[in-house]
Amino acid sequence: KVMNDLLRITKQHNVWIGLVSHLRKMGTAGQSFEEGRLPTVDDIRGSGSIKQISHDILAFARNITAEKEEERNTIKLSVLKSRYTGKTGPAGTCKFDYETGRLHDGLYDDMLDGLNI
């Protein structure tokens, strides 16, 4: 019901609504989300209608256990669903600035050298 209501509002008012969803807890096998594993559509917790009704689904991942501060502060972005283009996959990176609390544009390739992202 909630997702259908949100969809109706977006169409009625020609707006984009961003919805934040938590991830399912995963088993012990493989890389964890805390270690920077990018979520998939199936990792989204909650109603299946989130996956079905959404026009776009974006995923963000950050390795909070990394030793290097630069790596801990680097966020990977990925498009999991795009109803408009159908294109999915890696969408770049951004950096969290603890001093300002802001996200900055992606890192250049030379800055990525040596980072496990």
How does the language model describe each region?
Residues 22:
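Active-site beta-loop-alpha junctions enriched in small/polar residues
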Residues 1-16, 25-117:
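C-terminal regions of RecA-like/P-loop NTPase motor modules
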